[in-house]
Amino acid sequence: IPVVNKRITVSPIGTVCAGYSRDQMVKVCKLLDDCATDAGVDFLGGFGALVEKGITPGERNLIDALPEALATTNHVCSSINVGRTRTGINMDAVKLMGHRVLDVAAATADRDGLGCCKLVVFCNIPEDVPFMAGGYLGVGEADAVISVGVSGPGVVKKAIDRAVRRRGEQVSITEIAEII
């Protein structure tokens, strides 16, 4: 199965950089982007916050930094968790993220709103997410963890290629659906 994207995640930056200003959060995002480039990975996740029960000043600064941060970086992805079944939905966070999603889209309009492809707003985010764009290293994880994920598109492509080799070019759409 081909490796489609190489990804790394960090602990939620809203927690790690809790005392940072908006401008400092943008600088952190750019630093993370440089690290992703140096590491040779396609995506770096973790520029995010867990705000389901309230928003700290640092988390608010991170959220306010999202438009500039995602518009000026290539590899960094962000996830914001706004609710949990047990604790409810932080409606202030939902409202704030509604505005920030629009701001990110506007900030990356020259690239077809690409920033929004690097931003996920969750409810019930898992404790650790290795998949982009919502990836982050869970706070209960060890300092170095390897998660191996199977790429859905890579698996599908490999299965279709195998069927075409076996049956020739005459693979029907029904057969492809069955393979998938």
Where are these regions (language model features)?
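Anaerobic metallocofactor- and corrinoid-dependent redox/one-carbon enzyme cores
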Residues: 1-180
